[in-house]
Amino acid sequence: MLQQAERILQEVLDAFDFGGQVAGVLRYGQGHINDTFCVYVQQADGDAKRSILQRINTDTFRDPAGLMENIVGVTEYLRRVIQEKGGDPERETLTVIRTKKGEAFFTDSTGGAWRAYHFVKDTVCLQQVQTPEQFYQSAWAFGNFQRLLADYPAHTLHETIPKFHDTRDRYKKFEKALEADVCGRAVEVQAEIRFVREHQADCAVLMDLLESGKLPLRVTHNDTKLNNVLLDKKTGCGLCVIDL
């Protein structure tokens, strides 16, 4: 099993253009959905160039091609906007590393889907907030992400997990799960169940506004947590939104 995993990893490393000979690979980060690795490439000056390699969880994201088309579209748009505003697109948004065949992701011989990004240097990714300012900076980064993408043609994005944001559908599934009560735990959370049912109408508000045209379709991140923002190591300022 270990030999097969090493063979697949080597197959993946050979597929991407990391800009040199790979010197090492280590598991990286504390993500729960995708498997993340840091790839080290030795450079002529002795420094090690780093890249991020991820195996996409295709049980969660069953359309990796659509997912990566979304990410490439959004990040390339962000690069243009950031540059126009005098920013540094190499640090302020993700940069997709393409395969040697020019593709945005690679499918290995077992069907696994892989993607790679440039490593954003001189940043920190916090798992736990230490100061109110850090929370502010993470919120600022997500707000800036939304602002920069305000004019992005959101209708061109693929819905990679169908009805994931459809709160009316979520409520229907809640009622089905409640009726099935497969673990027999509903009796322990009657107050919470009552609260949700009392607010059933709220579940339709955003979807109704969207369908009526009163709420414009926009790009959203939808996993706006502290460890999905890179902070500048020197200034502590919110720099780059990740895990798109």
Where are these regions (language model features)?
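ATP-binding pocket architecture of kinase catalytic cores
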Residues: 44-72, 76-156
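ATP-dependent phospho-/nucleotidyl transfer catalytic cores
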Residues: 1-3, 19, 26-30, 54-65, ...
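Hydrophobic HxD+1 residue recognition
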Residues: 224
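Juxta-kinase regulatory segment immediately upstream of eukaryotic protein kinase catalytic domains
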Residues: 1-26, 74, 78
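Catalytic-loop signature of eukaryotic-like protein kinases
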Residues: 227-230
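Conserved active-site aspartate in kinases
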Residues: 243
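Active-site beta-strand-loop-beta-strand hairpin of nuclease catalytic cores
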Residues: 40-50, 235-238
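ATP-binding glycine-rich phosphate-binding loop
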Residues: 18-44
